[in-house]
Design a protein with these regions (language model features):
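Exposed, interaction-prone assembly regions rather than primary DNA-binding/catalytic cores
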Residues: 84-202, 206-209, 213
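Accessory beta->alpha helical hairpin/"wing" motif in late/C-terminal subdomains of nucleic-acid enzymes
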Residues: 39, 49-74
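Short acidic, hydrophobic short linear motifs in intrinsically disordered regions
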Residues: 16-26
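Short amphipathic alpha-helical interaction segments
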Residues: 27-44
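Short helix-capping/hinge SLiMs at alpha-helix to coil transitions
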Residues: 10-16
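Short, amphipathic alpha-helical interaction segments positioned at domain boundaries
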Residues: 63-93
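Short alpha-helical "packing" element that flanks the helix-turn-helix/winged-helix DNA-binding module
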Residues: 3-8
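Long, compositionally biased intrinsically disordered regions
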Residues: 186, 191-194, 202, 206-208, ...
Length: 421
């Protein structure tokens, strides 16, 4: 099958996709080959490119459907075609989009879906099964596996560990990643704060943790039992890093809420305040190639690993530095600078809030592409940004309320010019 046919086979299974997200969805195809495949498909009239939500999207055309059916009919059986060509709208469509986006991100990060490698969660929890042996030997000590929400529900029902009501709530959980570093609960909020009920999510997380803790695998394998005993952690997947201040403030514009008592809608949205009632640690990754790398780091590196990564960066990029422990985080003073430097190899929401609450100003080192979302979250105390190659990065300046202080935002028409000191 040619690269163009692989592209069409994938587009056949979905309604449409952002053009730039194809590199994530088809991560096994080299970038240049994918670009050429798209160009050829457009030339042949097999795909259509259109604008949606201010970005280019791509979908298969009727000619493309006819072509791929003729060349790949053995793999595109009639039942699969009927299911994949069905067009979903409303909340059901958004849920499917969240699952597809999360699945693509995990595949690109080297985290396979359990159902795609033929491992069942219910079988994995029994130590004398082949699925358990395969999981422990091939995946547990690596990046782990992604178990989607429908399989979690089926396992809860099959084990009878908790009541069936734990599977029928309107939880927004997409799935969980299990590896030797912990259990990560994945949510996909796309480009806006989605509805998120604390009681539903708490009940769901408790039910999943209970079936894992009470399993044969937990009782007979110390490493698996250790993972089950760790604190709950969530990974929030959003369209861009502009979602970071929105999640932290609970405001759809990312502005600080001045009167929380009148912000009742946020009580039922995916916000950090609500997340912290269920999860001890909450992380964010955007849906792009940078997000793939951040997702991989988030689920494979402990806080000690991250602090070692920071220490290694300092050794390579600075002449002299002094590290200070601040809770479990690392702060540093570089080359006798009076202002501290914060280094963010991943985006942990609690760390951003903790550092913003401090009194000192700071320089920030982070991945290129995350700086504007972090700048809006951190506010007045940010001095400047550098990327992980120690190169300066431009970023808008914001005050502590999340309002631009270096000009007017052309989209929201809010902001001001700060007077020079």
């Amino acid at each position: 099958m040619t690269n163009e046919q692989k592209l069409l086979s994938y587009l056949y299974t979905i309604d449409s996709i952002q053009r730039r997200q194809l590199v994530i969805a088809l991560s096994d195809m080299p970038y240049q080959s994918l670009t050429l495949a798209v160009r050829n498909a457009v030339k042949h009239g097999y795909v259509e490119v259109f604008r949606k939500d201010e970005s280019n999207h791509i979908r298969i055309s009727q000619d493309g459907v006819k072509y791929i059916r003729s060349v790949a009919k053995d793999s595109l059986d009639s039942e699969k075609r009927a299911n994949m060509k069905r067009r979903f709208k409303g909340e059901q469509g958004r849920r499917l989009n969240r699952v597809e986006t999360t699945s693509c991100m995990c595949r690109a990060a080297g985290i396979p879906l359990a159902k795609e490698v033929g491992i069942s969660l219910s079988e994995l929890l029994i130590t004398d099964t082949q699925d358990y042996a395969r999981f422990m030997n091939d995946y547990f000590y690596d990046k782990g596996l992604l178990f989607l929400s429908d399989e979690l529900s089926a396992t809860i029902k099959a084990t009878h560990t908790v009541g069936e009501e734990y599977t029928t709530g309107r939880s927004r959980l997409v799935g969980i990643i299990i590896n030797c570093k912990g259990i990560f609960f994945l949510y996909c909020t796309l480009d806006k704060l989605m509805r998120w009920i604390v009681s539903y999510e708490h009940r769901r997380a408790d039910a999943i943790t209970k079936i894992l803790k009470d399993s044969d695998a937990s009782k007979q394998n110390a490493d698996f039992d250790y993972v089950c005993s760790l604190m709950y952690k969530s990974v929030i997947i959003g369209k861009t890093c502009a979602m970071i201040p929105k999640i932290i403030t609970g405001n759809k514009y990312g502005k600080a809420v001045t009167n929380p008592g009148k912000n009742g809608i946020a009580d039922n949205l995916l916000t950090l305040t609500n997340l912290e009632q269920v999860y001890a640690r909450n992380y964010f990754v955007p849906t792009n190639t940078l997000g793939v790398e951040l997702l991989s780091r988030t689920v494979t590196l402990t806080r000690d690993d991250l602090n070692q990564m920071i220490e290694m960066w300092l050794s390579e990029m600075t002449n002299t530095h002094t590290c200070v422990d601040a809770r479990e985080y690392t702060e540093t003073y570089i080359d006798d600078d009076n202002e501290k430097t914060l280094i963010f190899p991943i985006i942990e929401l609690e760390e951003l809030v903790y550092q913003k609450a401090g009194r000192e100003k700071y320089h920030i080192v982070c991945e290129r592409g995350t700086q504007d979302g972090i700048s809006r979250t951190m506010g007045n105390k940010v001095i400047d940004f550098k990327d992980m190659n120690n190169e300066p990065m431009p970023a808008h300046k914001y005050d502590d309320a999340g309002i631009r202080r270096d000009g007017i935002n052309p989209l929201t028409h809010s902001g001001y010019w700060e007077e020079e000191p």
